[in-house]
Design a protein with these regions (language model features):
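Short, flexible loop/turn elements at secondary-structure junctions
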Residues: 16, 54, 67-69, 100-102, ...
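Conserved GNAT-family N-acetyltransferase fold
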Residues: 50, 63, 101
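Short, cationic low-complexity segments
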Residues: 126, 235-242
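C-terminal "cap" of GNAT-fold acetyltransferases
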Residues: 211-224
C-alpha cells in the first residue's frame, strides 16, 4: 500500500521508514497525551501510516490505516476490542479502519484535513474499498459537556440497525442517557464523516488510557453524495497509487 499526494502547502504520503513511524508515534503522543514520548501499540506493525507534512517537511498530521479484505476479518481491527462488530462482520466487502488520526495543535488548518481526505479517497478508489470506519474521539472522559452533540447524533446519524455496533467495552454511556445541556461541538473529523453521509453507533466508549470518549463511526463509500464524491476525486487526482 503506497500513496503520494500533494496540494499546495501540504503533502500526504505513507510512512516508509522506521524514522517515519517514530515521527508518527511522537505526534500521536503529543496530541493524545501531551509532551514528549511515543504512542505505540501492537496494531502499528500491521497498519499503513499516513503522514501529512508542510512545505518544510514537518509532520502536521497522521493517521493509521488497517486494510481488511472483508467483514470476516474485522475481528483483528482496533475497534473490535471496544465494540461488538458482528453486524459488519457479515459484509463481504473490503474495508479500511482509520485510527489514531491527529493534527498538531499549531496546524489546525482546514487544508490539513482536506489533504488527508484527498489521500484517503485515492486509496479508497484504487482498492475498491466499500467501508471506512474508526473510533472518533472527544477530549476527556465526561460526556456531559458534549450533551447536545450526542443528542444530535442520536436523532440524526445512527447507523442501520443491522450494521450498527453493540456495546462491548467495560465503560460505555448511551447517547439517550446524556442530558442535552453541554454545548461543546463535535470534533472536525466526525463532522467530516457525517457531511459525507457517515453514521455512528448509539453510545460512546470511555477510554481511560487515552483519556477520551470515542464513538464508532462508519462511512459507506457508496452513500457519499455525488457532488462530494466528485470533489474528493478531483482533489485526489494527483495521487499515485498501486
Amino acid at each position: 500500500m503506497t500513496i503520494s499526494f500533494q496540494d499546495g502547502r501540504y503533502a500526504a504520503r505513507l510512512a516508509r521508514t522506521d524514522a517515519d513511524l517514530i515521527a508518527c508515534q511522537r505526534l500521536r503522543h503529543q496530541c493524545f497525551f501531551g509532551g514528549a514520548g511515543q504512542d505505540r501499540d501492537a496494531y502499528d506493525p500491521i497498519c499503513g501510516h499516513v503522514m501529512v507534512e508542510d512545505q518544510a517537511g514537518r509532520l502536521v498530521a497522521t493517521a493509521r490505516l488497517l486494510e481488511i479484505a472483508s467483514g470476516a476479518e474485522i475481528g483483528k481491527c482496533y475497534a473490535a476490542g471496544c465494540y461488538d462488530l458482528s453486524g459488519l462482520a457479515t459484509c463481504d466487502a473490503p474495508m479500511i479502519e482509520v485510527g489514531r488520526f491527529c493534527i498538531a495543535a499549531d496546524a489546525r488548518d482546514a487544508d490539513v484535513l482536506r489533504v488527508a481526505w484527498g489521500a484517503f479517497t485515492g486509496l479508497v478508489d484504487a482498492r475498491g474499498i466499500a467501508f471506512l470506519f474508526g473510533c472518533t474521539s472527544f477530549a476527556g472522559t465526561d460526556p456531559v459537556p458534549y450533551g447536545q452533540a450526542f443528542q444530535r447524533l442520536a436523532a440524526r446519524h445512527l447507523g442501520p440497525d443491522t450494521l450498527r455496533p453493540r456495546p462491548k467495552a467495560a465503560e460505555v454511556v448511551r447517547f439517550a442517557d446524556i442530558p442535552p445541556e453541554g454545548a461543546i461541538p463535535m470534533p472536525p473529523l466526525l463532522r467530516t464523516y457525517l457531511a459525507m453521509g457517515g453514521w455512528v453507533c448509539d453510545h460512546a466508549v470511555i477510554d481511560r488510557h487515552m483519556q477520551t470518549l470515542h464513538v464508532f463511526t462508519c462511512l459507506e463509500v457508496a452513500s457519499v453524495p455525488p457532488a462530494r464524491a466528485a470533489a474528493l476525486r478531483a482533489l485526489a487526482q494527483t495521487a499515485s497509487l498501486p
